């Protein structure tokens, strides 16, 4: 099977998890990843490498869901995944590592770099996908929106734009430069 990182309905995720086989070797890689990911190290980066068809995307998707922990038909992903640990050498240790993920909330961004424009480099591509995952634009407008989010001003901005533009919502205005730029200027003059 080819793993599509964009398929994320509950049924599709459940089916992919049911088909995932956690070998001792994969469990060791999972443990190494969780050790680094849950450490105090800042800006942990991970690079998955392997031959074509070796299961990198599948493993990455399972990691993403373990971190994000979505509910699948009323049961958390981590709870469903825990059945994969039964019988492994380090079952209890890995279970504790997975449980430690609950200490924080994460924003997981899964994307296939082969299907995304990477003409401006991997950092730009990853940032664009991050912005899209937050429901923001994947351009300079998205950077402004993200700045407003970080400063707890985004909701005020949305209300102000709607008020200043005869009830038109920002999500509709931002699609067109002819409407987004004037709306941005008016609102930013008030907010900043």
Q: In which residue ranges do the predicted regions lie?
A:
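Short coil/loop residues immediately preceding or within conserved phosphate-binding loops
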Residues: 43
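Short, functional N-terminal and low-complexity linear motifs
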Residues: 1-3, 28-30, 89-96
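Conserved P-loop NTPase "ATPase switch" module shared by AAA+ and STAND
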Residues: 192
